[in-house]
């Protein structure tokens, strides 16, 4: 979702990666799509964030069960594989912010009609906390370069990062 440049506000993040880290230092956030086959029938689009308390991603028990269920109900879903520890909360939430913008930016090429359907996000536990932080600190036109001054914004960062609906769960 980030391309060649990714904002990082975590101090000395490379030193935080150990043998016990959930991801390796080369991890890059990405989205796993679950798209309605006939977009004219799609009821909306939902970003799904698993829990894991910012140290792991509980995808098998949460995101990978929820996304297919929403797809069966007629909703496009994207499971966000966001950064986790040793990255700080700002970096993790910027991944969510970027995913909102990324989906809005690419919606036309995927046939997703965001003019007539809603874009929302749901999160479990740590993912719910990330979602609440997005709504509190990373909404609208706030861009990553306001947190990481070395980051250079691109055309995707010019897209508004507001959601139509947010569903934080436990």
Describe the residue ranges of each PLM region.
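Primarily recognizes the serine-hydrolase "nucleophile elbow" in alpha/beta-hydrolase
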Residues: 98-170
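Short beta-strand element of the alpha/beta-hydrolase
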Residues: 42-51
